[in-house]
């Protein structure tokens, strides 16, 4: 599925887990968001994303990983020309795109009731 600055492909799903391949286009910025029902583990496959995890920004490199706990505010940014590819493993009770609370989004998808 292609959604503006990113695309994703569901690779494998099991009971309470989902594996995706994420692609973040050059200069792409995803929503600043959190999830109530899942944690995520990201493995960087290509590129150098800047990850926001709560209030900290961290640059990651190929073959590095980062854990995003349930409830943590997070974002992926790609300030470079090369597409970022990430293997995302979601674990939790609800693994749907509806489990997203957005705080910032360049496409206007923040709902006032969500971000408070």
Each language-model region and where it sits:
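Conserved short histidine dyad/triad with adjacent acidic residue
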Residues: 20-37
């Amino acid at each position: 599925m292609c959604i503006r600055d990113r695309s994703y492909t569901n690779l494998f799903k099991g009971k309470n887990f989902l594996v995706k391949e994420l692609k973040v286009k050059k200069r792409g910025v995803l929503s600043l968001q959190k999830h109530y029902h899942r944690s995520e583990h990201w493995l960087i496959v290509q590129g150098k994303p800047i990850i926001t995890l709560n209030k900290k920004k961290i640059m990651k490199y190929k073959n590095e990983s980062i854990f995003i706990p349930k409830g943590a505010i997070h974002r992926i940014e790609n300030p470079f020309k090369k597409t970022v590819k990430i293997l995302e493993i979601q674990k939790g009770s609800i693994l749907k795109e509806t489990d997203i609370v957005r705080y910032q989004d360049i496409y206007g998808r923040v709902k006032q009731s969500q971000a408070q």
